[in-house]
Amino acid sequence: MLRKSVLELSSRLSIKRFPRNLGAQRFHLSSSRNASTSGKNGLPGAKPVGKPDASKVDPPKVTPPPPTKGNSSKVVIGGVAIAGAFLVAYQTGYLDQYLGKEQQKLSERIHSDALTEKLEEAHHLNVPSGVEDSTEKDGKVETQPQVTHSEASEGVQSDIELQPESDLSSDRFTYISSNQEETPQETVIDRAEINLPISASEDSGAKPDMPSEIISEAESVKLEAVPKPGDSPIIVNAQSSSVHRESETESASPKDPAALKTPEDGIEREVQLPGSLLKEYNLEGSDTESTGSSSIGEQITKETEAFPNSTEGLKDSYMTEDGKLVLDFLAAIHAAEKQQAHLDAQVFAEELRALKEKYENELRDLRARELMRIEEAAILDKELKRERTKAAAAIKAIQERMEDKLKAELEQKETEAQLALSKAEELAKAEMISTIAKEKAAQIEKMAEADLNIKALSMAFYARSEEARQSHSVHKLALGALALDDTLSKGLPVQKEIDTLQTYLEGTHKDSILGLVLSSLPEEARSNGTDTVLQLNQKFDTLKGTLRHFSLIPPGGGGILAHSLAHVASSLKFKEVDQANGGIESVIKKVDNYLAEGKLAEAAATLEEGVKGSKAEEIVSDWVRRARNRAITEQALTLLQSYATCVSLT
């Protein structure tokens, strides 16, 4: 993963840009050193370089050393040896105190452009041309801009300021040269002083509970390898092999530096961590430039002398500043990854909050619409109940009015009948009295003719009495016929009226045909009544659609397809020119005509004959039966009225 990150950083180097306040403050250093071909190395000596001109931005031209086979082999062997010594020292816990110092106090982000450029310059200046091709493939480094936790939470931006070139003194730069004067070699120490505005809370380490990867940043870069006395000078660059090994070692080790310390490192546990990496690398700004350069030399001397005194043979290795650079660079990469994840989480939370607000607004709108629809439904329900109440009240009022009207008519008819009966009785009584008086007078006058006259009067009396009785029975028969007609017009049961008529016929018309007619009335009409002509018309209109549908289905029934085709065919209406073809529409037309003429029996017979042999025969059977009952009852009523009329005339 580290190799992938290094390659990505290298590929993004071309699109990076320098901040506006750092564009004119980049500085480049070059130096040369002379060495003889004898192969003996002297102690490292610093050669001061004059201050670079502030007005000139372009770096001075540097003549690269001639590529030699021996030089390349020395660089490769020295790099491998330093990397192995560094790994051994790291695994044994010798570097814990330095790692703890580096990872605890870093709180601001590293400037990616400055770090990348310094690595490239050191790479091109220190690596010979023979080795440069192999190191360029794996040594490309790029760092992404990072934002610390304090900047993400508080929105504070920290600017990285470099010292102007005019303020840099020659004491800031040291060079390693050998005592050999015949073979020229060159090494470059590129140092940059970075001033970071850090708050007091960050300087004092106010957040110990935060991971060191989040708050750590690399603040300085030192590309100088200090050789051990007696060895040839070796320039160590940020090569891909050492970086890869160190990254694997760091990933395999625990994150907490204190956990790496062994019981044997009792002295190292007592060492206090410095305030920041700037103080450790002597890169923090001071009042005087001379004191800074002297402290750099002392620090290098102490570090050089500390390495030979490390525990056992494996710890006797080079602890160069390049190792710290790699660790700082790895810590910066981890911090960038952590910070990028933190920023992604913030962006995701913001988008989630926006979506939540959007859906909450939509939910509120939907709830408001739902409440409006509920209110509308309640209003419509109230109106419907009110209309139902009005309709029920109107129906009840009409029923009461019709019942009152019927009662009034019945009372009027009974009163008229009673008056007519009383008049007839009075007339009969008067005639009887007069007849008796005449007979008595005739008996007094003619005793001889008394017996004859009495018989004649008796015969006349009996004749008139029979006439009066017959007249009275005819009146009762007419009243019964009227009552039967009224009951049939309402569709009510006629059993009561039939019983009354049979009572009237028992005394005078025992042998008449009326008894047979009344006994032939259907039992359903007597007990339940018959439908009126209007009701029969309404029921037939209701049956028309069903009649059209079931007339196309055989008596045994059909499946879903038969019913579907019958439904479609029944919905299509065609005007039939010839009504004698026996189609369902012609049958319906004939029945309508018969109903309009009042011929119920013919209508029932026509309908029954028209739907015979189809499924509709079962549907119309009830209507045909009711129509025939009505027809029979009306025929009996017509016969009764005709008989009463004939009797009254004779």
UniProtKB/Swiss-Prot annotation:
Q: Which GO terms describe its molecular function?
A: cardiolipin binding
How would you summarize the oligomeric state and partners of this protein? Component of the mitochondrial contact site and cristae organizing system (MICOS) complex. The MICOS complex associates with mitochondrial outer membrane proteins. Present in a large lipid-enriched complex called mitochondrial transmembrane lipoprotein (MTL) complex made of proteins located in the two mitochondrial membranes, including the TOM complex and the core components of the MICOS complex and containing at least digalactosyldiacylglycerol (DGDG). Binds to TOM40-1.
Question: Where do transmembrane segments lie in this chain?
Answer: 75-95, 550-570
* Keywords from the UniProt entry: Coiled coil, Lipid transport, Lipid-binding, Membrane, Mitochondrion, Mitochondrion inner membrane, Transit peptide, Transmembrane, Transmembrane helix, Transport
Here the disulfide bonds are none
Concerning what turns on (or off) its expression, the entry says: Accumulates in the mitochondrial transmembrane lipoprotein (MTL) complex during phosphate (Pi) starvation.
Query: Segment Disordered: which positions?
Result: 26-74, 121-168, 239-267, 284-304
The record's InterPro entries line, in alphabetical order, gives: MIC60
UniProt-listed PANTHER family: MICOS COMPLEX SUBUNIT MIC60, MITOFILIN
> What ranges does the Mitochondrial intermembrane topological domain annotation cover?
96-549
Q: How does it sit in the membrane?
A: Multi-pass membrane protein
Gene deleted: what happens? Altered mitochondria morphology leading to the presence of several big mitochondria with a round shape. Altered lipid homeostasis; reduced levels of digalactosyldiacylglycerol (DGDG) in the mitochondrial transmembrane lipoprotein (MTL) complex during phosphate (Pi) starvation, associated with the accumulation of phosphatidylethanolamine (PE) in mitochondrion.
Q: Where in the cell is it found?
A: Mitochondrion inner membrane
Name a Pfam family for this protein: Mitofilin
- Please state what the protein is called: MICOS complex subunit MIC60, mitochondrial
Supply one GO BP term: cellular response to phosphate starvation
The organism's superkingdom is given as Eukaryota
User: Where does this chain mainly localize?
Assistant: mitochondrion
Compositionally biased residues, Low complexity: 284-299
Report one GO cellular component: mitochondrion
Q: Compositional bias of type Polar residues: which residue ranges? A: 28-40
Positions on the Mitochondrial matrix side per record topology? 35-74, 571-650
Which protein family is named in the record?
Answer: Belongs to the MICOS complex subunit Mic60 family.
